[in-house]
């Protein structure tokens, strides 16, 4: 995939490095010459020193051929303007970073496909872990309508030694994976839950607390 990333801060740098290592064609844009020089030496990407709100800069980056445009500079107005410019070239997907969550609806109404806030994501993640005692990790999916919970089944939990099909027909959750030691298994209805199993469950947001209790409480 051909991806243009505007802004070589912490988010842009990390994202570009990860995507380039996975074989994507990356173009980086930043207005700071020293930052561009450093990124050029460390990331397998075309690095352009320029203003991403200028048409010439975007065209130099090959905006006409890009599959995705990601604006993660530290300035929301720059991210919005450059994303809308990219959109005018018919690009398939634009992603823009914001810091103030109240701008999210505005960005989306104006045509930015995906609006993200690293600060808000981090805050939500910590809040969810606090709200879900016993959960090792979680991921918010489906535009916030669902979560993937990761937990270890306690020794005296009610589900220990039960087969998944014995838990009843799931309405609001799905067990998607179980770690038996270091081995990842995709479970079936006949899979037996054991004490110490590390389990990943996809669950509707509103049912997350009830499902957590079902698997963890004695």
Curated annotation (Swiss-Prot):
Gene Ontology cellular component annotations, sorted alphabetically: plasma membrane
Keywords, in A-Z order: Ion transport, NAD, Potassium, Potassium transport, Transport
Entry superkingdom: Archaea
RCK C-terminal domain residues: 136-217
Record-annotated RCK N-terminal domain positions: 1-116
Any single Pfam family the record assigns to this protein: TrkA_C
GO molecular function: potassium ion transmembrane transporter activity
SUPFAM superfamilies named in the record: NAD(P)-binding Rossmann-fold domains (SSF51735), TrkA C-terminal domain-like (SSF116726)
PROSITE patterns assigned: RCK_C, RCK_N
Residues reported to bind NAD(+): 7-11, 30, 51, 73-74, 97
Chain coiled-coil ranges: none
PANTHER family the UniProt entry points to: POTASSIUM CHANNEL PROTEIN 2-RELATED-RELATED (PTHR43833), TRK SYSTEM POTASSIUM UPTAKE PROTEIN TRKA (PTHR43833:SF5)
Domain notes: The RCK N-terminal domain binds NAD and possibly other effectors. This is expected to cause a conformation change that regulates potassium transport.
Function: Part of a potassium transport system.
Assembly behavior: Homotetramer. Dimer of dimers.
Name the record gives this protein: Trk system potassium uptake protein TrkA homolog
Organism: Methanocaldococcus jannaschii (strain ATCC 43067 / DSM 2661 / JAL-1 / JCM 10045 / NBRC 100440)
């Amino acid at each position: 995939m051909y991806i243009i990333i505007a802004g070589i801060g912490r988010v842009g740098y990390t994202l570009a490095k990860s995507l380039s290592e996975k074989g994507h064609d990356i173009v980086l844009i930043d207005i700071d010459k020293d930052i561009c020089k450093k990124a050029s030496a460390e990331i397998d990407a075309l690095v352009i020193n320029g203003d991403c709100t200028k048409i010439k800069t975007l065209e130099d980056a090959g905006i006409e051929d890009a599959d995705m445009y990601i604006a993660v500079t530290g300035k929301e107005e720059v991210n919005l303007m450059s994303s809308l410019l990219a959109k005018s070239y018919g690009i398939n997907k634009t992603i823009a970073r914001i810091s103030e969550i109240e701008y999210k609806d505005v960005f989306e109404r104006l045509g930015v496909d995906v609006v993200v806030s690293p600060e808000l994501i981090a805050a939500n993640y910590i809040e969810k872990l606090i709200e879900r005692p016993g959960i090792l990790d979680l991921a918010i999916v489906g535009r916030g309508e669902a979560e993937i919970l990761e937990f270890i089944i306690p020794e005296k939990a009610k589900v220990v030694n039960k087969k998944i099909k014995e838990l009843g027909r799931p309405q609001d959750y799905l067990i998607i994976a179980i770690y038996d030691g270091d081995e990842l298994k995709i479970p079936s209805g006949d899979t037996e839950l054991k004490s110490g199993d590390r389990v990943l469950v996809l669950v509707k947001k509103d049912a997350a607390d009830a499902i957590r209790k079902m698997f963890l409480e004695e």
